[in-house]
Amino acid sequence: MNNDYKWETVGRCKFYTDGTTCTDIEVMDDTKEISFIYPKIMIDREKCKKVFSSVEIMLIGRNAISIVIPNKMLPNIKHVESKSSSFINGKYLIERAGGKLLNVFGQSEDAEIDFTLFNRIGSYAFEGCRATKVSDSEDTGFIRINNNAFFGSGFMNQPFVNGIKCVGSLVVDVDETADEVIMPKTGIQYFPDKFVKCMRLP
């Protein structure tokens, strides 16, 4: 273990950090806000299974340049307030450069995801998100998507329709057992990297 790392308290939260990079977080019960003041927040998605469901506001300090956290860690974030030039204010965690969605957080089952707010989607950005609707399906067709962007999300839990699962105009999954897959006529973006035995365009 790196001896330069130690636990530091910021508000009602504790951060395991060397002053530059934070690799672990603890949050006191009933805490509503979390402040990211360190340049880098790097929480390993594979190792960290912590969930801080009471936190609703994320405050980002001006020195923050990189935030990597599991989407399921802070499921109930409702507002991101950023003093950093690297991130924007809003209801999702979005990098300013390139408009990349990092975390959409939990969202309710009846929430509509606003795809007009970002141009790219990072890996696992939707993991644990319960939403299954988009606010305007036409705005999903020109978005660059990283691998596993919708992994573990409500969108992926939906049943196949004509052998596919769609998020707006994005085809995000294909039924590999289907004898025939029918793609929409227009305005689609094919995302999953799967072999399809038979595909028909109406």
Where are the language model's segments positioned?
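Structural signature of tandem-repeat unit edges
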Residues: 1-123, 127-147, 151-168, 172-202
